[in-house]
Amino acid sequence: VRLVDPTDEALASFVPDSLAVTLGGIADACRDGLLAVAVEAGLATALAIMNEEADALCGAWNARDPERDHERGGTTPTSVVMGGQRLPIRRPRVHALDDNGKRAGEVGLASYGIFAQGDLLNRVAVERMLAGVATRSFERAADPIGAKARKAASSTSKSAVSRRFVTGTRKALDELLGRDLSGLDAAVLMIDGVDFAGQMCVVALVVTADGTKVPVGLRLGDTENKTVVTALLADIVERGVDYSAGLLVVIDGAKALATGVRSVFGDLALIQRCQIHKRRNVKGHLPAKARDALDARLRGAFADPDPETGLRKAKRLAAELDKTHPDAAGSLREGLEDMFTVRRLGIDGTLARTLVCTNMIESMIGICRDTSSNVKRWRDEGDMRRRWCAAGLLEAERKFRRLRGQRPDAPTRHSARPSRRSCHATVRY
């Protein structure tokens, strides 16, 4: 049985035709389950492949070849990655020979480099910690590789797991912030902020023309201020997001978000403000006994199939509130035109209900919060918050489904320099 991908050239040439595994070792491992057997066989395979590579360099044992340019140097204790842990093994050593037959230095075995690489351990550490496994519980949550192997294993201590998690999440951060976005057919952009231990992390989510959701960036700051938002959007544009055909941008009620969007995208962005946030803000300015009735009227105005009729209803409600609750009226009027952008684009049904609020990006943010819920002590470094946030965003991406209500003829883009009252679709979902 070949225990390696034959397309892996680094290993394929060293895989032995046969493999000897001691019956005693297999029998002991069988008592601990199939994975323990696999680990026992895997260690034997790794050793056999390394010996095969040493034979290819040095020739057979006791060959006494005067033309050889490498010789064996015994073995040395080291470790390889098996079953999500580091397990001890004795690696053969090979030395290069100079023209006089003298040792010129040790030669690294390519096969050992593959077996010893720690990328798998980093991924295991990140996935388990994002799933809520604490560093102190990591050893108990490790794969059942057998009592003998577990006793000899390393890399499961709190400090080792923590180091690997930092490495893995830093890689996730680099992946998120380094993505080439030029290939995305961006139709919708959502922006919102998530609090990480007193600091605001502004995140961005793109929905492509086929309904795929893609987290595209994050920026750390004290609040959702214009500077942070503008820097985030400028970075997204620099990495290739094409908005030349227009972009629907969905945000909550924060003025800084709208200001940042307009400063970067200008007239090529149509802003849809979150209707749920608007209703919540207006209700917050009303006495408890008046909230339900007024919220029902506002909800009805937002749901009107004719956006201009809905806008008139909302303005009429604001005029009524001027007399009794002027603060609620002011809250309602702020950004009111932007509440009907999706309706003006001719989008209705489930897709419209999805795009008139920020629930989609808030769901992603909720996963970020869940993955970091076990953190008991946030250090002062901004890097820690950015790493956790990036890892949470990529974890959320794995759980995404395509946009609900997506249909082939639903317009989400508009012609250049559109008016707010009339948007002409140029790209279809």
Where on the chain are the PLM-derived regions?
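Acidic/histidine-rich catalytic cores and adjacent linkers
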Residues: 1-10, 15-29, 41, 47, ...
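RNase H-like nuclease fold core
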Residues: 23, 56, 62-63, 70-75, ...
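Alpha-helix N-cap/N′ positions at the starts of helices
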Residues: 117-121, 293
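Short, amphipathic alpha-helical "recognition" segments used to contact nucleic acids or chromatin
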Residues: 120-132
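Short, charged amphipathic recognition helices of the HTH superfamily
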Residues: 132-144
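Conserved beta-strand -> loop -> alpha-helix junction used to position metal-binding or nucleic-acid-contacting
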Residues: 218, 248-255, 260-299
